[in-house]
Amino acid sequence: MDINLTLIVQMLVFAAFVLFTMKLVWPPLAKALEERQDKIADGLAAAERGRKELELAQHRVKDELKQAKAHSADIIDKANKRASEIIEAAKEAAKREAQIQAKLAQEQIAQQVNHAKEELRKQVAKLAITGAEKILMREVDAKANSELLDNLIEEI
């Protein structure tokens, strides 16, 4: 292989091409590669942030769900307690009403008994007066008076 002028010119052209490429072509390519690398890194970082935010959101949802369940259980317990209180109050009111009705019934019974006693007294007094009239109209006879009193006692 001979080293001649063509080989030297080709080396100079190649060196000029390398310089031209290093000065004008390589920096935009390197910049584009770096931008692409940054863009991919940003995308990966954003994906990681999104994954972490998703995990946090899932934890918050679980916590809020637990709180909602606890709150609903508390509301149900309060409602059951209130229902029990209402039932107890209704039972007490019914018991008081029953006592009042029983007392009124006893008072009515006592009034009816007193009325019956009064009527009985009136009838006894009437019978006594009638018996006394019969005794006075008849002759005074111990045996007859005794029989009249026995009859009077039987009527009473």
Swiss-Prot record:
PANTHER family: ATP SYNTHASE SUBUNIT B, ATP SYNTHASE SUBUNIT B', CHLOROPLASTIC. It is found in: Cell inner membrane. The keyword Membrane applies. One of its GO terms (cellular component) is plasma membrane. Belongs to the ATPase B chain family. CDD domains: ATP-synt_Fo_b. One of its GO terms (molecular function) is proton-transporting ATP synthase activity, rotational mechanism. Keywords: ATP synthesis, Cell inner membrane, Cell membrane, CF(0), Hydrogen ion transport, Ion transport, Membrane, Transmembrane, Transmembrane helix, Transport. It comes from the Bacteria. F(1)F(0) ATP synthase produces ATP from ADP in the presence of a proton or sodium gradient. F-type ATPases consist of two structural domains, F(1) containing the extramembraneous catalytic core and F(0) containing the membrane proton channel, linked together by a central stalk and a peripheral stalk. During catalysis, ATP synthesis in the catalytic domain of F(1) is coupled via a rotary mechanism of the central stalk subunits to proton translocation. Component of the F(0) channel, it forms part of the peripheral stalk, linking F(1) to F(0). This is ATP synthase subunit b. The gene is atpF. F-type ATPases have 2 components, F(1) - the catalytic core - and F(0) - the membrane proton channel. F(1) has five subunits: alpha(3), beta(3), gamma(1), delta(1), epsilon(1). F(0) has three main subunits: a(1), b(2) and c(10-14). The alpha and beta chains form an alternating ring which encloses part of the gamma chain. F(1) is attached to F(0) by a central stalk formed by the gamma and epsilon chains, while a peripheral stalk is formed by the delta and b chains. It comes from Legionella pneumophila subsp. pneumophila (strain Philadelphia 1 / ATCC 33152 / DSM 7513). The chain crosses the membrane at residues 5-25. It is a single-pass membrane protein. InterPro entries: ATP_synth_B-like_membr_sf, ATP_synth_b/b'su_bac/chlpt, ATP_synth_F0_bsu_bac, ATP_synthase_B_chain.
